[in-house]
């Protein structure tokens, strides 16, 4: 029998992760959406693939299920906690009011002063419990602020990278 969801979350909160804002553009409309995501990882350098895990209850899930949907992963710097909170807690229409946004090759919004970003098309997807894992093929990327330390999340709070 698997462990409880509560036990699972309790264990995983002890694993530090980077913080990203995943932004989505639906080709079926002009709707854009974004949410804070820590379930992000690299998959393959050839072809360049990454993954994000999105809850089925999220608006992002509905948009990513649209044929031809694209998304960007904006990797946040240590000075972007407020923006992370904005995309975690505010209503959809208020999220993009902060930050300066450009449009990536795929049409997904990219944060101009992100530490780094990856612009992706949906390569494949896998339903996994309450979430779907989206594999994104990276179409474009940049590191606008290479000297900035990343924003980290560990044990229910934001952390800064202090060791060199």
Language-model segments: which ranges?
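Basic, polyanion-binding surface patches
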Residues: 1-164
């Amino acid at each position: 029998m698997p462990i409880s969801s509560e036990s699972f979350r309790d264990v995983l909160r002890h694993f530090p992760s980077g913080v990203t804002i995943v932004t989505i553009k639906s080709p079926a409309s002009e709707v854009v959406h974004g949410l804070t995501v820590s379930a992000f990882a690299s998959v393959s350098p050839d072809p360049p693939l990454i993954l994000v895990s999105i809850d089925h209850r999220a608006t992002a899930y509905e948009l990513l299920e649209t044929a031809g949907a694209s998304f960007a992963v904006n990797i946040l710097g240590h000075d972007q906690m407020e923006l992370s909170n904005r995309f975690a807690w505010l209503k959809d229409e208020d999220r993009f009011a902060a930050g300066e946004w450009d449009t990536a090759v795929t049409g997904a919004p990219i944060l101009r002063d992100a530490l780094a970003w990856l612009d992706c098309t949906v390569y494949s997807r896998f339903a996994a419990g309450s979430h779907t894992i989206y594999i994104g093929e990276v179409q474009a990327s940049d590191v606008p602020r290479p000297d900035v330390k990343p924003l980290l999340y560990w044990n229910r709070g934001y952390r800064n990278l202090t060791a060199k």
